[in-house]
C-alpha cells in the first residue's frame, strides 16, 4: 500500500502547506495531490510543489476535463512531467453539471464519452506517432464546424511527450469504474470501503477486458481518499 497526501483546493485565501508536504516526502509518502473547484486551479499548485520537492510524485485530483481542451491538458501535463523528471501524474474528472455549465459555460452531457475521447487524444499526443486527428461527440481535431475558417490542420506536438505519463480518472459509479479500467492507469473511487473491494472489482474487470493487452490490477492503481 502506498500513502499519498491530498492538499485539495484553496479556500478564500491561497496558501500551500509546504512544511507538511516536505514532511510527507521525508516520511516516504509516494504522492501529493492538488484539486480544483471554482477558484484556484489544480495545475499551478502542482507546479509549485514539484519545484520545491525532490522525490515525491505530484498529481492533480482532479483537473476538470470540460474546462480545458484535451490538447491544452496534454501540453500542461507534458511540461510538468518533463520539468519534474517524470514525477507528475495527470488526474482527470468530468466534474458535475453545476460547475461545468454554471462556471465554465459548456454542456455537461455524456461525461464518460468525454473521458474516453479526452484520454485517447492525450495519449495520441504523448505518443507522437502521427499528426493528431479526432472526430467524436465532444471533440473534433481539426475543427470543421460551420463556423470554422478551414485553415486548421492536423499537428504533432513540438515537445516530445512520454507515453509513460500516468493518467488517473475520478469515478462515482460502476460505469465510471469500468471506464477507468478501460482507459486509465488508476482511479479515484468515491465512498470506497477497503473491506468491500468486491463491489468495485467486477466493473474494473469489465474495463480491463476492453483495454488493449492483458491489463489487470497489477497494471492499475486504486487511490481512494480517506479522512
Residue ranges of model-derived segments:
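Generic recognition of short, well-ordered alpha-helical segments
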Residues: 15-19, 44, 71-75, 182, ...
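N-terminal beta1-alpha1-beta2 module of alpha/beta enzyme domains
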Residues: 1-60, 165
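Internal, glycine-rich beta/alpha segment that forms the wall or movable "lid"
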Residues: 74-186, 190-220
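Active-site-proximal loop/turn and secondary-structure-junction residues that shape catalytic pockets
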Residues: 9-11, 38, 64-66, 94-98, ...
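Hydrophobic faces of well-ordered beta-strands that scaffold small-molecule active sites
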Residues: 3-7, 32-34, 58-61, 88-92, ...
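Short active-site-adjacent helix-start/loop capping segments
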Residues: 40-44, 66-71, 75, 98-101
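The substrate-binding groove and active-site-proximal loops of carbohydrate-active enzymes
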Residues: 62-67, 109
Amino acid at each position: 500500500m502506498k500513502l499519498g497526501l491530498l492538499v485539495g483546493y484553496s479556500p478564500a485565501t491561497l496558501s500551500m502547506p509546504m512544511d507538511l508536504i516536505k514532511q510527507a516526502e521525508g516520511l516516504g509518502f509516494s504522492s501529493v495531490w492538488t484539486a480544483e473547484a471554482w477558484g484556484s486551479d489544480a495545475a499551478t499548485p502542482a507546479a509549485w510543489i514539484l519545484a520545491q520537492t525532490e522525490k515525491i510524485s505530484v498529481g492533480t485530483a482532479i483537473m476538470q476535463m470540460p474546462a480545458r481542451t484535451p490538447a491544452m491538458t496534454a501540453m500542461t501535463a507534458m511540461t510538468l512531467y518533463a520539468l519534474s523528471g517524470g514525477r507528475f501524474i495527470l488526474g482527470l474528472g468530468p466534474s458535475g453539471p453545476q460547475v461545468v455549465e454554471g462556471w465554465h459555460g459548456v454542456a455537461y452531457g455524456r461525461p464518460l464519452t468525454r473521458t474516453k475521447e479526452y484520454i485517447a487524444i492525450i495519449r495520441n499526443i504523448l505518443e507522437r506517432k502521427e499528426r493528431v486527428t479526432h472526430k467524436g461527440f465532444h471533440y473534433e481535431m481539426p475543427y470543421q464546424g460551420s463556423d470554422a475558417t478551414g485553415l486548421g490542420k492536423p499537428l504533432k506536438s513540438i515537445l516530445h511527450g512520454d507515453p509513460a505519463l500516468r493518467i488517473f480518472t475520478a469515478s462515482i459509479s460502476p460505469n465510471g469504474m469500468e471506464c477507468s479500467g478501460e482507459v486509465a492507469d488508476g482511479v479515484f473511487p468515491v465512498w470506497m470501503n477497503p473491506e468491500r473491494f468486491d463491489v468495485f472489482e467486477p466493473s474494473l474487470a469489465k474495463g480491463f477486458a476492453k483495454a488493449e493487452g492483458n491489463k489487470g490490477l497489477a497494471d492499475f492503481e486504486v487511490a481512494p481518499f480517506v479522512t
